[in-house]
């Protein structure tokens, strides 16, 4: 009988320890699952809240500001005297940001006597004009002379004014010299205040840099994510309920073992 009682007691302790280990493992797995689920849902909500903005490539709009025009025409004229004249003008008009135009024309005249005349304009004959949006009037010789006279006058006045300014500065710098150490002395007492404020800001920043021991479930509840908070708490409640059930089973089994050991 004593052997049976001792064995039953040993079995009871083994059973209790085994159930406690299983309960701890089971509760830990449930807690870990709840924690992982809360993290996943928070990440999913953050991903849905962020708006994905696609980077639009800039459209390269190339606009040709110049237009090229080329005209070729040939004209032949014959008179009653048997004279024939052939003219072949070639005009190339190129218009760019500053529109330039160049015209080249060649004319050939042939008579019955076998004489041929060919006229080709030179570079001096081809006019080149430059057009701009802001036309500037030409400056004549009289206007240029007036301009130079005005500049000479202003230069003389500028030199005189510079000399006067130098004299005024030299006179003003004399009495201001002894005032510099006073300003330096006035600036020195302000230095420790800046140091104090810098230290205060550093201490304040170091306080804020300490990590706060708050769990993710509490953050989610405070942030207003009620769904995640409810899911995490529900899973934790389920794990606590399962743990209480396991404890109840352990107590029942313990009472049965003790009653069997006592009454046998």
From Swiss-Prot:
InterPro entries: MSA2
Membrane-topology annotation of the record: Lipid-anchor; GPI-anchor
Alphabetic keyword roster: Cell membrane, Disulfide bond, Glycoprotein, GPI-anchor, Lipoprotein, Malaria, Membrane, Merozoite, Repeat, Signal
Proregion positions: 239-264
Residue ranges of Sequence repeats: 60-91, 92-123
Presence of the UniProt keyword Metal-binding in the record: no
Ranges where the record places region Polymorphic region: 44-190
Major subcellular site: membrane
Region named 2 X 32 AA perfects repeats: 60-123
Glycosylation positions in this chain: 22, 36, 152, 168, 213, 237-238
Compositionally biased intervals (Low complexity): 70-81, 102-145
A Gene Ontology term for the protein's cellular component: side of membrane
GO biological process: cell adhesion
Covalently attached lipid (GPI-anchor amidated asparagine), positions: 238
Signal peptide: 1-20
Bias (Basic and acidic residues): 154-166
Cystines in this chain: 221-229
Comp. bias intervals (Polar residues): 82-101
Region (Disordered): 46-225
Subcellular compartments: Cell membrane
Further details from the record: Same sequence in Indian isolates FIS1 and FIJ4.
Entry function: May play a role in the merozoite attachment to the erythrocyte.
Domain notes: The N-terminal region appears to be involved in lipid binding.
Identification of the protein by name: Merozoite surface protein 2
Gene name per UniProt: MSP2
